[in-house]
Amino acid sequence: MLSRVSQVSRVGFSLARASSTARVWVDKNTRVIGQGITGKNGTFHTQQAIEYGTKMVGGVNPKKAGTTHLGLPIFASVEEAKKATNADATVIYVPPSGAAGAILEAVAAEIPLIVCITEGIPQHDMLRVKDIMKSQNKSRLIGPNCPGIIKPEECKIGIMPGYIHKKGKIGIVSRSGTLTYEAVHQTTMYGLGQSTVVGIGGDPFNGTNFIDCLERFTNDPQTEGIVMIGEIGGTAEEDAAEWLKQYGNPNKPVVSFIAGRTAPPGRRMGHAGAIISGGKGTAKAKMEALTSAGVKVVETPAMIGEAMFNMMKAAGKA
């Protein structure tokens, strides 16, 4: 696989850019292909996406090229699939050993949005992927080790349960998959709904961070409030707090929860990136940084929906 990674890293990138109507990367017009959709997990979640209304337009499997699966044409390569379907997004269900190669194949084909669900990709492989991603500007990676992205009632790319989502006004970004679903459920129950929900994943080396999502949500007219779910490890939340201080919209309230307050230093808590190291990455530091940026930081995930509703009500938006 690493030889394949090296090969893709030498691919040049043209100035052509696929057009998209999406404000936060996906909408009803997003055309999606799948890598690894003929496997058990890929088949299940692709079927769910089709039933949700996502425009799935094809799949990639070199060994099954020329056949169909779930009514979708299967192609030998991502490049071939893009040319035939005009896809502007791909979802990756490839096992860990081949996932980095799958990401880089999509980068080489200049797919605008790459969503990698796969968990357990070797960090060495992701370091290489991240380095290559920085050298181009045609593709965006969400993940890996994430639930994906969904614009309720329009497009679902990933493994999240579609039925708990409701079209609405809250943008949600999270490092945790299950806590994402909790925030979705609560904002649905309070009648706020969601504009777009992005699971950025819990690995140390991911493609899309909090700031990327905050920037999109801040500039998205449909998004009127933001929920941000972080966890211990790294400095992504502190960086997001600094961004909010400079560029945040005071008319778009932000609620946050940080998981892992009781975690001991040096012990990984679930995600590969959820570890306090060298005195950095503590929940306390993250909560203080976000609070100083005007974010309402809640003590438990059970308070996310209520806090968001109260802030929206105070702003005359609920």
Swiss-Prot record:
GO terms for biological process: tricarboxylic acid cycle. Succinyl-CoA synthetase functions in the citric acid cycle (TCA), coupling the hydrolysis of succinyl-CoA to the synthesis of ATP and thus represents the only step of substrate-level phosphorylation in the TCA. The alpha subunit of the enzyme binds the substrates coenzyme A and phosphate, while succinate binding and nucleotide specificity is provided by the beta subunit. It is an enzyme of class 6 (ligase). The keyword ATP-binding does not apply. NCBIfam families: PRK05678.1, sucCoAalpha. GO terms for molecular function: nucleotide binding; succinate-CoA ligase (ADP-forming) activity; succinate-CoA ligase (GDP-forming) activity. This is Succinate--CoA ligase [ADP-forming] subunit alpha. It comes from Blastocystis sp. subtype 1 (strain ATCC 50177 / NandII). Substrate binds at Y181. CoA binds at T38, G39, K40, N41, K64, I117, T118, E119. InterPro entries: Cit_synth/succinyl-CoA_lig_AS, Citrt_syn/SCS-alpha_CS, CoA-bd, CoA_lig_alpha, NAD(P)-bd_dom_sf, SUCC_ACL_C, Succinyl-CoA_synth-like. One of its GO terms (cellular component) is succinate-CoA ligase complex (ADP-forming). Residues 1-18 form a transit peptide.
